[in-house]
C-alpha cells in the first residue's frame, strides 16, 4: 500500500469510527430558545425511553453545578441512566451556561423557567415520538415536573429530593439552622410572611440582599403559592418520590407528606443520601465537602431506585 493510499485509508477509517460514535450517540448538543443542553444516548442498544432533567433552584447548570457548588451530580446521573438504556436530556437554565452573561436578574422568572422546560419536553417528544418520555425533577425541579405533568402527560415523573411543603415553610426551617441573631431571624421570617401574602419588602439590609433582592422576592412570591403536595395530588401519571435521609436542605418528612397526600406514587428513602445525591454522614457540617467534590460518585442506591420505577412502566 502506497503512502498516499495508507493516508486515504486512515482518513476513511477515522471518518467511519467518527460516524460509528455519532450513531452510538454518546453526547449530542441540543439547543432551544437560546438555551443549550446535552442529549446523552445509550450506546449499542435501542433506547427504552427518554428523560428530561429539571434542575434545582438557583443558577444550576446542566451538570448540576452552580457558582457556589460543583458536584457534577446531574452529569453523573445522566450518564448512569444512559448506561441503563435511557436517553437523557440535561439543559442549562436561563442565567447559566453560555448565555449567562446576557441575562439580567429580571429575565429569571418562575413562569419563564416553566415555559423553557415545557419547550424542552415538546422537543423530546417530537424527536423521539415512539418511546416514552419521562420527567426527572431535582429539588425545586420536582415542582416544575409536577406542574408540567398535570398538562403535558409524560410517561411518568421522578421526583428526587422534592419539597413536600410550600417554600415559605422550607425557607423558615433552613434559616432557623443558620447562626442569625434572634432579631435578624425575626426580620427574615417577617419578610417571608409578607411574600406569602404576596407583598414585597423595600429597603432590605445589604447583608440580606442575596436572599431578598427585588427580583428574588418576586420569584419567591410566585413559588410560595404552590403547595407541592396538593399539586402532586392532581397528577394522574405514575410517579416515584426519592428522598435522602441525610438531606440537610429538604428533610425526609417532605417526602413523607407527599406520599401521604398522593399515595398512588411510589416512595423510596435512601438513608444516607444527601441533597446533592451523594453518600454522606448525617452531620451536616461533615457533609459540606460533597457540595464541591465532583469526583465523589452518586449514592449507589439512587440509580437502582430510578430504574426500578422505570422498568415497571
Predicted regions and their residues:
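N-terminal cap/lid segment of alpha/beta-hydrolase-fold proteins
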Residues: 24-45
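Short, surface-exposed "cap/lid" segments of acyl-processing enzymes
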Residues: 45-47, 51-81
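Conserved alpha/beta-hydrolase
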Residues: 74-100
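Alpha/beta-hydrolase active-site loop
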Residues: 106-126
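Accessory cap/linker subdomain of secreted extracellular hydrolases
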Residues: 158-229
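Short beta-strand/loop motif that positions the catalytic acidic residue
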Residues: 235, 241-243
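Short alpha-helix in the alpha/beta-hydrolase fold that links the catalytic acid
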Residues: 237, 250-261
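Catalytic active-site module of serine/aspartate enzymes centered on a nucleophile-bearing elbow/loop
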Residues: 276, 282-313
Amino acid at each position: 500500500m502506497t503512502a498516499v493510499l495508507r493516508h486515504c485509508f486512515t482518513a476513511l477509517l477515522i471518518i467511519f469510527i467518527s460516524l460509528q460514535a455519532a450513531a452510538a450517540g454518546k453526547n449530542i448538543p441540543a439547543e432551544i430558545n437560546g438555551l443549550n443542553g446535552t442529549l446523552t444516548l445509550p450506546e449499542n442498544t435501542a433506547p427504552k425511553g427518554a428523560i428530561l432533567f429539571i434542575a434545582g433552584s438557583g443558577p444550576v447548570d446542566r451538570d448540576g453545578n452552580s457558582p457556589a457548588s460543583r458536584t457534577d451530580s446531574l452529569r453523573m446521573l445522566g450518564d448512569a441512566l444512559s448506561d441503563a438504556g435511557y436517553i437523557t436530556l440535561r439543559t442549562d437554565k436561563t442565567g447559566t451556561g453560555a448565555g449567562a452573561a446576557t441575562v439580567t436578574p429580571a429575565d429569571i422568572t418562575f413562569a419563564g423557567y416553566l415555559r423553557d422546560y415545557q419547550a424542552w419536553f415538546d422537543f423530546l417528544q417530537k424527536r423521539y415520538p415512539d418511546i416514552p418520555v419521562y420527567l426527572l425533577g431535582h429539588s425545586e425541579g420536582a415542582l416544575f415536573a409536577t406542574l408540567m405533568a398535570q398538562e403535558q402527560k409524560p410517561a411518568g415523573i421522578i421526583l428526587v429530593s422534592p419539597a413536600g411543603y410550600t417554600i415559605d415553610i422550607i425557607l423558615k426551617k433552613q434559616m432557623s439552622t443558620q447562626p442569625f441573631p434572634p432579631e435578624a431571624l425575626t426580620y427574615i421570617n417577617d419578610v417571608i410572611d409578607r411574600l406569602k401574602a404576596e407583598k414585597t419588602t423595600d429597603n432590605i439590609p445589604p447583608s440580606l440582599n442575596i436572599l431578598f433582592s427585588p427580583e428574588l422576592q418576586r420569584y419567591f412570591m410566585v413559588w410560595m403559592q404552590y403547595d407541592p403536595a396538593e399539586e402532586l395530588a392532581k397528577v394522574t401519571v405514575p410517579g416515584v418520590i426519592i428522598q435522602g435521609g441525610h438531606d440537610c436542605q429538604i428533610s425526609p418528612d417532605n417526602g413523607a407528606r407527599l406520599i401521604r397526600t398522593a399515595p398512588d406514587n411510589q416512595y423510596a428513602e435512601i438513608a444516607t443520601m444527601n441533597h446533592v445525591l451523594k453518600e454522606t454522614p448525617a452531620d451536616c457540617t461533615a457533609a459540606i465537602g460533597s457540595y464541591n467534590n465532583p469526583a465523589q460518585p452518586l449514592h449507589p442506591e439512587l440509580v437502582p431506585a430510578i430504574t426500578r420505577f422505570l422498568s415497571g412502566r
